[in-house]
Amino acid sequence: MVNVVLAGGGTAGHTSPLIATAMALQERGATVSCIGTPRGLEGRVIPEAGLQLDMIPPVPLPRTVNADLFKVPARLAGAVRKAGEVLQRRQTDVVVGFGGYVSLPAYLAARRAKIPVVIHEQNAVPGLANKIAARFAVFVGTAFPDTPLPKARFVGMPLRSQITDLADASGQARAERCARARADLGLDINRPTLLVSGGSQGAVAINEAVVAARTRLLADGVQILHVLGPKNIRGATRITDELTGASWLPMGYVDDMASAYAAADLMVARSGAGTVVETATVGLPTIYVPLPHGNGEQARNATSAVDAGAGVVVANADLDVERLLAETARIHDADVLAQMSAAGRGLMPAHAAEEMAVRVISAATSIDPTIG
């Protein structure tokens, strides 16, 4: 029996591929547990997925030079110590990290204990934790080709079975999934449907642009499933156009994004790695609005899908009512949507979770995980 500890959290961009890989490992007989921090989304979604979760202290890195920067070494040392205790208690054979500030203590604790480390990097531009650990990891899998990490191997994004099942559905089966998803969400099954989401935390710029354009979209007969983010849902209630009957349906968070994707004809979203890969894989045409902060990874994430014709990019600064209405007008052109959908399907490997599971078990059993 192989004991695997997976580390990653903060947002759905880290937790979703972690959970997908964990499920694939369990299917192969591995004993799986996870490491997270109290600050991240993992505190809810990992236990809900039926996985065991051990908590360690968070060690966020300040974006500017301030007093908190000088506290990082002591905080990191404490988190590494706690992670080491978890690895020892779990009798860990291999650590799998998905980036984010929870991963670095787990990586360093594993290295100290001489436990092999396997990495998955979700973004086209790698984060700091994975950059550090890639130097001593036995296998580095990436969601995008040409990610600049040592020993990187393009495997795709680990996706949960709900996403891969939707990706595999076509024709009548896909149409039935669409109708069922719309009905379950309280939407009209026959109406053009726009899905809007700024990721697990929401996105103010996208939310404001869509709300400003809402009246005109509804008057045009487009219904909107708007995932505002848990911090932005307060006071938001369903709005229906009296003449067209089209509705704006606000939600704080959607646990089953596969159903939201199935219900939609077109999406407006940030270009987090998970969103880009999932929308391309299921063939959902998407208008990507990259987060303008950070190291530019969101703009890079969208490149492959946009170059293939599966989506378009609108800069955050350019997103206003008129631009949004111009880009979403394609929702009425079935031929354009079909072309974009076809361009996305097959662009990314749909079964990366299974490949990652094979590599992880190989690393734990002293088989070279880079072979094959």
UniProtKB/Swiss-Prot annotation:
It comes from the Bacteria. InterPro entries: GlcNAc_MurG, Glyco_trans_28_C, GlycoTrans_28_N. GO terms for biological process: carbohydrate metabolic process; cell division; cell wall organization; lipid glycosylation; peptidoglycan biosynthetic process; regulation of cell shape. Belongs to the glycosyltransferase 28 family. MurG subfamily. Pathway: Cell wall biogenesis; peptidoglycan biosynthesis. This is UDP-N-acetylglucosamine--N-acetylmuramyl-(pentapeptide) pyrophosphoryl-undecaprenol N-acetylglucosamine transferase. One of its GO terms (molecular function) is UDP-N-acetyl-D-glucosamine:N-acetylmuramoyl-L-alanyl-D-glutamyl-meso-2,6-diaminopimelyl-D-alanyl-D-alanine-diphosphoundecaprenol 4-beta-N-acetylglucosaminlytransferase activity. It is found in: Cell membrane. Keywords: Cell cycle, Cell division, Cell membrane, Cell shape, Cell wall biogenesis/degradation, Glycosyltransferase, Membrane, Peptidoglycan synthesis, Transferase. Pfam families: Glyco_tran_28_C, Glyco_transf_28. It comes from Cutibacterium acnes (strain DSM 16379 / KPA171202) (Propionibacterium acnes). SUPFAM superfamilies: UDP-Glycosyltransferase/glycogen phosphorylase. Cell wall formation. Catalyzes the transfer of a GlcNAc subunit on undecaprenyl-pyrophosphoryl-MurNAc-pentapeptide (lipid intermediate I) to form undecaprenyl-pyrophosphoryl-MurNAc-(pentapeptide)GlcNAc (lipid intermediate II). GO terms for cellular component: plasma membrane. It is a peripheral membrane protein. Its EC number is 2.4.1.227. It catalyses: di-trans,octa-cis-undecaprenyl diphospho-N-acetyl-alpha-D-muramoyl-L-alanyl-D-glutamyl-meso-2,6-diaminopimeloyl-D-alanyl-D-alanine + UDP-N-acetyl-alpha-D-glucosamine = di-trans,octa-cis-undecaprenyl diphospho-[N-acetyl-alpha-D-glucosaminyl-(1->4)]-N-acetyl-alpha-D-muramoyl-L-alanyl-D-glutamyl-meso-2,6-diaminopimeloyl-D-alanyl-D-alanine + UDP + H(+). Its main location: membrane. UDP-N-acetyl-alpha-D-glucosamine binds at T11, A12, G13, N123, R160, S200, Q298. The keyword Iron-sulfur does not apply.
